[in-house]
Regions:
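Hydrophobic alpha-helical topogenic segments used for membrane insertion/localization
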Residues: 2-22
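HotDog/MaoC-like acyl-thioester-processing domains
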Residues: 15-61, 153-155, 160, 166-208
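Catalytic strand-loop segment that frames the active site of acyl-thioester-processing enzymes
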Residues: 60-111
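Preference for bulky hydrophobic residues occupying beta-strand positions
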Residues: 96-98, 147, 178, 194
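Histidine-centered catalytic micro-motifs
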Residues: 109-115, 147
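Short amphipathic alpha-helical face segments that pack within enzyme cores
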Residues: 115-123
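Hydrophobic beta-strand-centered segment that forms part of the acyl-chain substrate-binding groove
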Residues: 122-165
Length: 208
């Protein structure tokens, strides 16, 4: 009797362990796959994908002088944006799906607030690169980002990050507003305003 009971208990424990492994694998798969809202937006023809070679081609990136991986778009990024799409109608808008991965964790189960700040910096910069109506990487730089953190982000979350041009001053200053939110329930996790400064070289090339 005892042997049979022990065997049954061992079998039950093994089944529970197998179920837990399956659940964890399923969660990892769900977390790794872009959400439906992003796939639906991405398929709309008015949204143009940014084609940025240094995000997509690690070998080319290394051979072109970069010494590491992209902080937000690299394969090992703690908060990763696979790509941005943009709409050049006024006001210019940029949208992406941000995956907050395990490496962004600070408080148990929650991501570090700095991960949201880094994301705001990134999308404000890339919105500035698109201000000419086409994506021109490294045609300027972000000089100011004011971020307000509202709601913590749980580890594993996929959130919508978006930005739009608010106004331009002269030929170089571009003021941009951005937001991080959950399209599923409308929760706004943070907002930001930033100043992007277009390079003198970009203006000289006539991309104003």
């Amino acid at each position: 009797m005892r042997a049979a009971a022990a065997a049954a208990a061992a079998a039950a424990a093994a089944a529970a362990a197998a179920a837990l492994v399956h659940l964890r694998r399923r969660r990892r798969l769900m977390h790794a796959c872009p959400p439906e809202w992003w796939l639906a937006l991405r398929s709309q023809p008015e949204w143009l994908p940014m084609r940025v070679r240094e995000w997509e081609d690690a070998a080319w990136r290394a051979s072109s002088g970069w010494v590491g991986v992209d902080f937000v778009h690299g394969a090992s990024a703690a908060v990763r944006v696979l790509e941005y799409v943009f709409k050049s109608d006024e006001p210019l808008q940029v949208v992406g799906a941000a995956h907050f991965r395990n490496g962004a964790e600070s408080h148990k189960g929650l991501c570090h607030g700095g991960s949201m700040c880094a994301l705001m910096d990134d999308i404000i910069g890339w919105t500035g690169f698109c201000v000419s109506g086409e994506c021109v990487p490294w045609s300027g730089f972000t000089v100011q980002v004011n971020t307000r953190l509202s709601v913590p982000v749980p580890v594993g979350a996929w959130l919508k990050v978006e930005a739009q041009v608010e106004r331009c001053e002269g030929k170089r200053k571009v003021w941009i507003r951005s937001k991080l939110s959950d399209p599923n329930d409308g929760t706004v996790h943070c907002t930001a305003e930033g100043l992007f400064l277009r390079s003198a070289e970009a203006n000289a090339r006539g991309t104003a």
